[in-house]
């Protein structure tokens, strides 16, 4: 029994590695900055509430196959693998703008797996997953709720909606062009056949969940006080779909909590404050991109925001920096986990291909933003 529990604990830690790294980092910094009343100022309750509300409603929509059916219908319009891959990538791209990058991947990676395996096109799986991953990370850059770091910076600096999109539009357009070119160049227009399996969604619950989704988005855009969503959305889902509340990615929320503690403490260590302030003064954009490659984009956004008011370059840096290493984005770990789960023994080749495409995208986008 003990060994069984130990196995379950190890499996849980492996599944939530980033959360445990964040927890350890937070605990270590507590030795340098002992807990006090200032800790309460570390936590951005509104950001955590927005994340929870969006994740909960997305889980409810996922449970009625809303995204799956929507995506599958779009894919079935196309008759060759190149167009199908483009459709999968664009669905993930658009989905990340609406439901955040990690949830877009959790929703549409299984669809990509289904399309490729059911049509005998498994050879394109690594490429498709990598493009979906890049699309999720870069597609989410355009909107405040497209990824967690955007939501955090948007809330912290109170960035106006129009200004936010003006900052992110140029690299967003370049990303669209690059992703499209890659899919055209690396995927042949081979014929594609897929069985049409009818699927329906309950109309009443669909309307209800879409209304809740609209409420969640209104909270993100500051149209409604966050506490209203924190009361209404869980209350409705308790009766409509209790399972959705259990499915919420709570480790992601805890990761944020731990990184709030970590970044808050780091900001109070004099040596760290002086070093980061110096580096960010030299180039906020470049340092934030590099930081993402080491500690991921979400913690980079949380940590570096303590040392600079240059939210424009920080916003660009933590979005562009989301592509690069496997740990540059929490979403990339989702893709890696999903791919290796179905392709054991191909980890090395996947990491090589992943690194080649991601670093190419990062360098091109960083150069574009710095030059133009």
Model features per residue range: what roles?
Residues 2-3, 7-38, 50-65, 184-189, ...:
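Structural signal for alpha-helical transmembrane segments and their membrane-water exit/capping regions
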Residues 8-15, 37-47, 159-171, 198-204, ...:
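Interfacial loop-to-helix junctions that mark the boundaries of transmembrane helices
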Residues 42, 64, 68-71, 212-309:
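Transmembrane helical segments that form the transport core of multi-pass membrane transport proteins
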Residues 44-47, 76-89, 118-128, 203-208, ...:
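Membrane-interfacial loop-to-helix junctions in multi-pass transporters
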Residues 72, 185-210, 242-246:
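Flexible interhelical linker loops that connect adjacent transmembrane helices
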Residues 90-138, 152, 302-315, 344-346, ...:
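Hydrophobic transmembrane alpha-helices that form the pore/transport pathway of multi-pass ion
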Residues 120-188, 193-198, 337-365:
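Membrane-core helix-loop-helix motifs of multi-pass transport proteins
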Residues 165-176, 286-372:
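C-terminal transmembrane helix pair
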